[in-house]
Swiss-Prot record:
It comes from Schizosaccharomyces pombe (strain 972 / ATCC 24843) (Fission yeast). It is an enzyme of class 3 (hydrolase). One of its GO terms (cellular component) is cytosol. It catalyses: Hydrolysis of terminal, non-reducing beta-D-glucosyl residues with release of beta-D-glucose. This is Putative beta-glucosidase. InterPro entries: Cellulose_deg_GH3 (IPR050288), Fn3-like (IPR026891), Glyco_hydro_3_AS (IPR019800), Glyco_hydro_3_C (IPR002772), Glyco_hydro_3_C_sf (IPR036881), Glyco_hydro_3_N (IPR001764), Glyco_hydro_3_N_sf (IPR036962), Glycoside_hydrolase_SF (IPR017853). Belongs to the glycosyl hydrolase 3 family. Its EC number is 3.2.1.21. Residues 397-556 form the PA14 domain. Keywords: Cytoplasm, Glycosidase, Hydrolase. GO terms for molecular function: beta-glucosidase activity. It is found in: Cytoplasm. GO terms for biological process: glucan catabolic process.
Length: 832
């Protein structure tokens, strides 16, 4: 491939070959042209780990901390390192293009995919993305930055029009992409599902051609989100290079040939699209492998240490009023709560993957102390019933899981053809990429079998949701029918039915046979626009029914019996997931009641909250010690334990504002689609910029996070160097422990010709200091970017003459130093 110039290759391709290049061949591969030694390249999710090429029975992977966790580090060097390790994971799986990072904006707290994105702030988002991308590129793996643009909610994501002012579009939503383009020159970009101001982004000439290609002079490859193409000619003309996945809905080779032959589609435009795909192949040539490349296990002690470091440095200490943290390892401990023993390593949807291993909060803490910590569930926090595979035993292997036998005929047939036989360890299975040559028209049937031995006499609740059909039997007695009558879900990623449930009383120690008869998506009884070839999915759950009050009472007794409690509550991948937005900021079920109860029972309680987006904390005034963690990947529990016991000084900062209540947030009145539209009425006042403008008190401000030590900023000095503003200051560690602080630089225009935020983050720097150490820090700002607003009247950026405040602090609220500089004249500009 490298022996040929892209222009030379284009001249050697015929129209059908050019057309082939414009769409994928399957879920994860581009088309190869063997005649010219043009290889196929492999793409894969994603933003917090590399899944590989399969949803079904996928190979295990390293799960990195989610986007908000990485944003919370405010650490460019660390983010570059994240990119390097992601690249090594990609190479192990033969992946040339990683579908990430995600730089959509946390406009409101309810976005189901909010956890994937870095921040509510466009500068932090853009710079974080830049360094992850640079890390990937340093190892010859390409990033596909996403989702361009305004994919900031899941509600009606394929059809909703985001109605946004040009100024807000530029300053808030396009800016992360613009910064990443400027500083990393990413080689590919993914369009979003939604419309912007009435037109789907994947066919918007204004966004793809006028801004991205012409104004920013970007030369990369534009890729659709999966099934996010809505036209043939219009999308090609606008600049969409690659329709994914294959087989394409629109870019049929014969149709493209016909359009070119009839002069309805210009061959020169076809050439441009094909050239851009070839550029991506060329950039990826060093990592290009055959389509059947074996996906290797890349797990290592070095990787584990890196994942632990990434996770540890993202954890945010929100309260330590009584200096309870760090804890001594002496004494007795209890780990309580629904997030304690279940490792919520990732959010849901396409970001989710099968991890090499996981470490729960309970396991991480248990590994640090001499004895065994007490445990109490306290309450459930599931949306659908917990994964049944954790309770089932595979009759063949004797391990957790079940047998899954695949047939061409349903269970009612006498003579059945066995086509596959698996031992599976997950009760949530997607068949979107399952394939068997013997299958006809997408039809296959699975007999699922395992046994369950209850640990006590109790009522057990079973549930199953499907894209397909299913019957669930206990000892050959039908318990759940999700076949003859089905009810659809509103979920746009987990297609199919709601979870059908039923309960049964089971006796302790008895072996019960659990059997499910599943039919693929082709057997689904409800209408859908999805092809039966997508295979379908099932999710089987089971839980022992508990009395909520009794469970909290037990947790209280456990809390009273120990010296210290670590209380773990929060959200999960069910609540924060692609395809569905949250409806509330409150914690699930009786979580808040549990927190109140434990806080009143033991004065030495460390509350640990977990989520990828803001949550309400009605008990906050009673909690003196509070840590917030995110979906922190494989090493979640070890990272938390390092912070709790003082092996790592917390240094994470909130990349998003935590409002007190849902109704306080700027998007409260216009977050969902209303008759196909969502108006971004808060305009440029997103996140902290809104709360400061209306002087609304928040729970925790943007950029906030405590340490076990203390810092002092002093001696601010500014120098205007023309295009750059030089900022010098000193920072001292005035406390007893080594630690890191994030210096945050905000800019505020003093006299304004337009309505602007009170201040805006424009740069940041992480500094590590030993006790009593002082360092001189230099930060440089691009004055043009630091001072400009988008002038809608002139359709250009405007850096306006006048005085500007420089505000230097450790959060958006905690400003320690201020200075001023003056711009002598106004300039208008475009481009990067």
């Amino acid at each position: 491939m490298m022996e040929h110039d892209v222009e030379d290759l284009i001249n050697q391709l015929d129209i059908s070959e050019k057309a082939m290049l414009l769409s994928g061949t399957d879920l994860w591969h581009t088309a190869a042209i063997p005649r010219l030694n043009i290889p196929s390249i492999r793409l894969s999710d994603g933003p917090n780990g590399i899944r590989g090429t399969s949803f079904f029975n996928s190979s295990p992977s390293a799960c990195f901390p989610c986007g908000t966790a990485l944003g919370a580090t405010f650490d460019k060097k660390l983010l570059f390192e994240v990119g390097e390790y992601l690249a090594e994971e990609a190479k192990a799986k033969g992946v040339s293009v990683v579908l990430g990072p995600t730089v959509n904006i946390h406009r409101g707290p309810l976005n189901g995919r909010g956890f994937e994105s870095f921040s509510e702030d466009s500068t932090l988002s853009g710079l974080a993305a830049s360094y992850v991308i640079l890390g990937l590129q340093s190892k010859n793996v390409q990033a596909c930055i996403k989702h361009f643009v305004c994919n900031d909610m899941e509600d009606e994501r394929n059809s909703v029009s985001i109605d946004v002012s040009q100024r807000a579009l530029r300053e808030v939503y396009l800016m992360p992409f613009q910064l990443a383009c400027k500083y990393s020159n990413f080689k590919s970009l993914m369009t979003s599902y939604n419309k912007v101001n009435g037109e789907h982004v994947s066919q918007s000439r204004i966004l793809l051609d006028n801004i991205l290609r012409k104004e920013w002079e970007w030369k990369g490859t534009i890729i659709s989100d999966w099934f996010g193409t809505y036209s043939l000619k219009k999308a090609i003309d606008a600049g969409l290079d690659l329709e994914m996945p294959g087989k394409p809905r629109f870019r049929n080779v014969n149709t493209i040939q016909h359009l070119v032959g009839s002069k309805e589609l210009s061959e020169s435009i076809l050439d441009e699209r094909a050239k851009n795909v070839l550029k991506l192949v060329k950039h990826s040539w060093q990592n290009t492998e055959a389509e059947n490349h074996c996906e290797l296990n890349n797990d290592s002690s070095c990787l584990r240490e890196a994942l632990k470091k990434f996770a540890s440095q993202s954890i945010v200490l929100l309260k330590n009023k009584k200096k309870l943290l760090p804890l001594s390892r002496k004494g007795t401990f209890a780990v309580i709560g629904p997030n304690a023993k279940v490792c919520n390593y990732s959010g849901g949807g396409s970001a989710n993957l099968k991890p090499y291993y996981t470490v729960s909060m309970y396991d991480g803490i248990a590994a640090k102390i001499d004895g065994v910590p007490e445990y109490a569930l306290g309450c459930h926090n599931y949306l659908n019933l917990p994964n049944i595979a954790n309770l089932l035993v595979n009759p063949r292997t004797g391990k957790h899981g079940y047998v899954a036998k695949f047939y061409l005929e349903p269970a009612t047939s006498e003579n059945r053809t066995l086509i596959d036989d698996y031992d599976l360890e997950d009760g949530v299975v997607r068949f979107y990429d399952y394939c068997n040559d013997k299958m006809k028209d997408g039809y296959f049937y699975i007999d699922i079998e395992g046994y369950l031995i209850p640990d006590e006499d109790a009522v057990y609740e079973f549930g199953i949701s499907v894209f397909g059909t299913a019957l669930l039997f206990i000892d050959d007695v039908l318990l759940i029918d999700n076949k003859t009558k089905q009810t659809p879900t509103n979920h746009t990623f987990e297609f199919g039915t709601i979870e059908e449930r039923n309960s049964i009383y089971l006796k302790k120690g008895r072996k019960y046979n659990v059997r499910v008869e599943y039919g693929s998506a082709a057997t689904y009884t409800l209408s859908t626009n999805l092809s039966p070839s997508t295979g379908g999915r099932y999710s089987i759950g089971c839980v022992k029914v508990i009395d909520p009050e009794t469970e909290i009472d037990y947790a209280v007794r456990v809390a009273k019996s120990v010296d210290c409690v670590i209380l773990c509550v929060g959200l999960t991948a069910e609540w924060e997931t692609e395809g569905e937005d949250r409806k509330t900021m409150t914690l699930p079920s009786l979580s808040d009641k549990l927190v109140y109860s434990i806080l009143q029972s033991n004065p030495n309680t460390v509350v640990v909250t977990q989520s990828g987006t803001p949550i309400e904390m009605p008990w906050i005034s009673e909690a003196h010690t509070l840590l917030h963690i995110w979906y922190n990947g494989n090493e979640l529990g070890n990272a938390l334990a390092n912070i709790i016991f003082g092996e790592q000084n917390p240094c994470g900062k909130l990349p998003i504002t935590f409002p007190k209540k849902l109704k306080d947030n700027p998007a409260y009145l216009s977050f969902r689609s209303s008759r196909g539209h969502c108006v971004y009425g808060e305009d440029v006042f997103v996140g902290y910029k809104y709360y400061e403008a209306v002087e609304r008190e928040v729970l925790f401000p943007f950029g906030y996070g405590l340490s076990y030590t203390t810092f002092e900023l002093s001696n601010l000095y500014l120098k205007n160097c023309g295009e750059r503003l030089r900022i010098d200051l000193e920072i001292s560690n005035t406390g007893p422990m080594s630690g890191a602080e994030i210096i945050q630089v905000y800019i505020s225009q003093i006299v304004r010709s337009v309505n602007r935020p009170v201040k805006e983050l424009k740069e940041f720097s992480k500094v590590v200091l030993c006790p009593k150490e002082t360092k001189l820090i230099r930060i440089e700002l691009d004055i043009k970017y630091a001072t400009s607003f988008y002038d809608e009247l002139n359709e250009k950026w405007c850096s306006e003459e006048g005085e500007y405040n420089v505000l230097v602090g450790t959060s958006s609220k905690d400003i320690a130093l201020t200075g001023k500089f003056t711009l002598p004249k106004t300039i208008h500009w475009t481009g990067l």
